[in-house]
Amino acid sequence: MMQFILGFTLGNVVGMYLAQNYEVPNISKKIEAFKKDVEAKKKPPE
């Protein structure tokens, strides 16, 4: 039981630390860039 509590607590502390310090990628910007890329490929070359 003690091992479970210690592991659970350590996991929570590490998770909170990573959540505060991890730079989350901006997904909406990546989607917009992907859409522009697809639109550029759809247009026939002139």
From Swiss-Prot:
It is found in: Mitochondrion inner membrane; Mitochondrion outer membrane; Mitochondrion intermembrane space. Keywords: Immunity, Innate immunity, Membrane, Mitochondrion, Mitochondrion inner membrane, Mitochondrion outer membrane, Transmembrane, Transmembrane helix. Pfam families: DUF4535. It is a single-pass membrane protein. It comes from the Eukaryota. GO terms for cellular component: mitochondrial inner membrane; mitochondrial intermembrane space; mitochondrial outer membrane; respiratory chain complex. Microprotein involved in mitochondrial respiratory chain complex III (ubiquinol-cytochrome c oxidoreductase) and complex IV (mitochondrial cytochrome c oxidase complex) assembly. Required for the formation of mitochondrial supercomplexes (SCs). Also required for the activation of the NLRP3 inflammasome. This is Short transmembrane mitochondrial protein 1. It comes from Danio rerio (Zebrafish). The lineage of its organism: Eukaryota, Metazoa, Chordata, Craniata, Vertebrata. The gene is stmp1.
